[in-house]
Amino acid sequence: MPVSCLFVGPDNVDLAELGKRGAEKVFCMISERFAVPEEMLYKDNMIGFIREARPEIVLFGATNFGRSLAPRIAAGLKTGLTADCTDFDINEEGRLVQVRPAFSDNIFAHIQTVRDPQMA
């Protein structure tokens, strides 16, 4: 499965370094408007990009900003979102299996989102 990366932010990142981290393609939305993390600005721009690019899977970092932004984007795209994943797998049908602790960390839930993009 090909891996792509979307960088959203001001022009202060080493784009070549992003490509060295395993992404086959690096997409960029560069603007000084993104210098301050503001959920609604990021949300609107990222939803537009995701609708156009049509990725099967979208993953977010478990940062404070990622935890605030991801559910807004999932709601805007009318898809599911699984938070706090500890592992991922791709099943025989090519769907993302999202693994996360459940029931006070006594078991691990294996979750699949039924529509694209699958988000975690």
Enumerate the predicted regions with their spans.
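N-terminal glycine-rich FAD/FM-binding segment characteristic of electron-transfer flavoproteins
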Residues: 1-120
